[in-house]
Design a protein with these regions (language model features):
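Secreted/periplasmic carbohydrate-active enzymes, especially glycoside hydrolases
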Residues: 1-180, 188, 394-400, 425, ...
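Active-site region of glycoside hydrolase catalytic domains
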Residues: 114, 228-336
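Alpha-helical structural signal in soluble globular domains
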Residues: 105-107, 192, 196-202, 233, ...
């Protein structure tokens, strides 16, 4: 219930029309609903302003008692709504997500009766099926965009908070993902969620509360009323890119017409697997080598076209596992309990995932198993994203227009995490996804032993150098090669050169790829661990991503020098960490942890990188931050350790 004055305004909408082909002129059409809640007629003035742009417009209108009328301001009637050289809104890595603000008032007899404000972005998002395989291709401001997206699942009990929303979306942006699909079995998220997506440059694919395993609502009028209010609430957000009625179902009669009536500026399809979007999979653990040969799905080729659901699990960290179940069920692994926390064993965490972990050597404790489990999760994520990088648009073996990772966030405590778990504790998958999706990226193909470079920027780079170095288990360099490249806007340079591994190389070894600019400054790097194990096909867990890693346990010890300082700025607590590998050995899979007085991770905390490796003499800066209200009482500490680095604890 709310009170109004003599006139009220609701549901503003700003439509942008951009001039082609330059996108250098915008025409804005503004509409708003004006309400007369009184029992008599009202004469009022409706006024608007695009703040900071010296754009103002107004109309005088009369409303009879109880009337609600949509008032429209067009650029033909108000030329000031024509904007030269508008600041366009762009998704992540494509440009700045610039935003404007619209303020509106309704006044009666010179007194403001009601007011509102909303932010909006000037951009155009379209899609078509003008592709070799008729898959759906998206465009932003006239440019093709390769969708590297994900599927958003709401918290299991809908226990949302601004803190949780901020953390999950900040992790999302950090990962490099550019689109979030609001899965049809979920909800329409909060205004704050969309506000953050606007600011972070994250596109949103919005579905409307129907899945393939549910019936249509009994009260369809109520459903359509909810649909109407949701579209009106969300349509000014530039991040909102696409409407889909359902997940693997059909639309409620009238849904499409209603959506197009309320907002004809975005595309629409009936359900998630039609109109150039094929059915998904894989969902569970497979041999990571299968991603390269495109055999990961039992449904056939799925690294092609637009795939709405393609993913793999990750084991949570040790600290989270101990919050999921009792110690007695953690180790030895109680298959019944683990399967219960894995959707009935759906992701194969107690079977195939465990077998992959054991290929790093049989574990003697849950601590050892959890540590090795992060390697498997990191390999899962990195191989998937890099295979899709390789096949981006028409640069690879087949046309690929987009991937939506299944799934993104954990709705409940479970043993099948993703980039982070329900407790908001990141796994190694976040940081290895972040590396795979960096906008300028050199990558290695485990099946072909080839090196490629991907550019996700809308600009080109000339006279860059890509370099590959291979080190054996004792950190001896056994291969090195570099090549100068020019890479075009949004381009992929595939199979630039092959790495020839020496026949006598240690069974496990490491690859470091570096990308340097024309001045010799390194702008990107990637680190891999690889075994000599031959890949014997998808039916068994073999291959250089998947088996033969036992000798990693014999890796010589490395030493890290750690320096740090703390500060508080604008309500955030920061730890600036400087690391240097002072030994002659590679420091493999180094992990930093910010812990409270009980030795538990401070959550949510944000690390610029983690689970990384450092060459002898290499340095790295890591910034950790959290809200200051997380560090008000007690002692806190920073731990630094790694696969072959003894963990050290530093009091903060």
């Amino acid at each position: 219930m709310y009170a109004t004055d003599k006139a009220a305004i609701r549901n503003p909408f700003i439509r942008s029309e951009l001039a082609k082909p330059g996108y250098d002129k915008a025409e804005e059409t503004v509409s708003v609903e004006v309400i007369n809640p009184t029992t008599g007629s009202v004469k009022c003035v409706v006024a608007g302003e695009i703040t900071g742009e010296n754009i103002r417009f107004s109309k005088e209108i009369s409303l009879f008692c109880g009337e609600t009328r949509e008032i429209v301001f067009t650029p033909e009637e108000f030329p000031q709504l024509k904007i030269d050289n508008p600041r366009l809104w762009w998704p992540l890595f494509k440009g700045k997500p610039d935003l404007y603000e619209l303020k509106m008032t309704v006044s009666v007899k010179g007194q403001v009766s009601d007011s509102l404000k909303t932010r909006f972005g000037i951009r155009e998002i379209t899609s078509d099926q003008n592709t070799p395989d008729k898959s759906r291709q998206f465009y932003v401001n006239g440019k093709k965009i390769f969708i590297r997206g994900t599927n958003w699942i709401p918290e299991g009990m809908l226990r949302h908070s601004d803190e949780r929303t901020y953390a999950e979306l900040r992790y999302t942006k950090q990962s490099g993902v550019n689109l979030v699909r609001m899965w049809g079995g979920g909800i329409a998220e909060s205004d704050y969620f969309f506000q953050l997506c606007d600011e972070m440059g994250l596109l949103v694919w919005q579905e409307f509360w129907l899945t393939g395993d549910t019936k249509h609502p009994h009260d369809q009028a109520l459903y359509l009323a909810n649909l109407e209010s949701t579209v009106k609430r969300l349509r000014n957000h530039p991040s909102l890119a696409y409407y889909v009625s359902s997940n693997e179902s059909t639309e409620v009669v009238g849904a499409k017409d209603l959506i197009m009536k309320l907002d004809g500026t975005r595309g629409y399809q009936m359900q998630s697997e039609c109109d150039g979007v094929h059915d998904g999979s894989p969902y569970k653990q497979v041999n990571p080598m299968q991603h390269y040969e495109n055999t990961a799905s039992p449904r056939g080729s799925r690294v092609d076209g637009f795939n709405p659901e393609y993913g793999a699990p990750t084991l949570p960290t040790l600290e989270t596992l101990r919050e999921v179940m009792d110690e007695k069920d953690l180790w030895p692994i109680n298959k019944e309990v683990w399967d219960y926390h894995d959707g009935g064993g759906f992701h194969l965490m107690s079977t195939m995932y465990k077998d992959l972990v054991n290929n790093y050597g049989t574990s003697q404790s849950i601590e050892e198993f959890a540590k090795k489990g992060q390697l498997v999760g990191a390999m899962n994520s990195k191989t998937i994203w890099e295979v899709w990088n390789y096949n981006k648009l028409d640069y690879g073996d087949r046309y690929c227009s987009g991937l939506l990772f299944w799934y993104h966030n954990c709705p409940v405590r479970q043993v099948c995490a993703r980039m982070w778990d329900w407790s908001l504790e990141p796994t190694a998958s976040l940081y290895h996804t972040q590396n795979a999706l960096e906008p300028l990226h050199a990558q290695f193909d485990y099946l072909k032993n080839m090196v490629s470079v991907c550019n996700d920027y809308y600009r080109s780079f000339k006279n860059y150098k890509v370099k590959a170095d291979v080190y054996d288990l004792n950190s001896k360099k056994v291969f090195s090669y570099s090549q100068r490249i020019d890479i075009g806007e949004d381009e992929v340079l595939n199979d630039l050169f092959k790495i020839d591994f020496p026949s006598d190389i240690t069974p496990v070894h490491f690859i470091r790829l570096g990308l340097s600019d024309e001045k010799g400054k390194e702008v990107a790097s990637t680190f891999y661990w690889r075994s000599n194990a031959a890949y014997e096909g998808k039916e068994i867990l073999t291959g250089p991503t998947s088996s033969g890693f036992e000798s990693l346990n014999d890796m010589p010890t490395a030493r890290l020098q750690t320096k740090y300082k703390t500060k508080e700025v604008d309500g955030r607590y920061y730890i600036e960490v400087s690391l240097k590998n002072t030994s002659s050995r590679i420091a493999f899979f180094t992990q930093l942890q910010f812990l409270d007085k009980a030795g538990k991770p401070v959550r949510p905390s944000f690390y610029t990188d983690n689970f990384f490796s450092l060459l002898p003499g290499e340095t790295k800066q890591v910034l950790i931050d959290t809200s200051v209200d997380k560090v008000t009482e007690g002692e806190f500490s920073l731990t630094v350790g790694g696969w072959n680095v003894q963990q050290k604890k530093y009091k903060l």
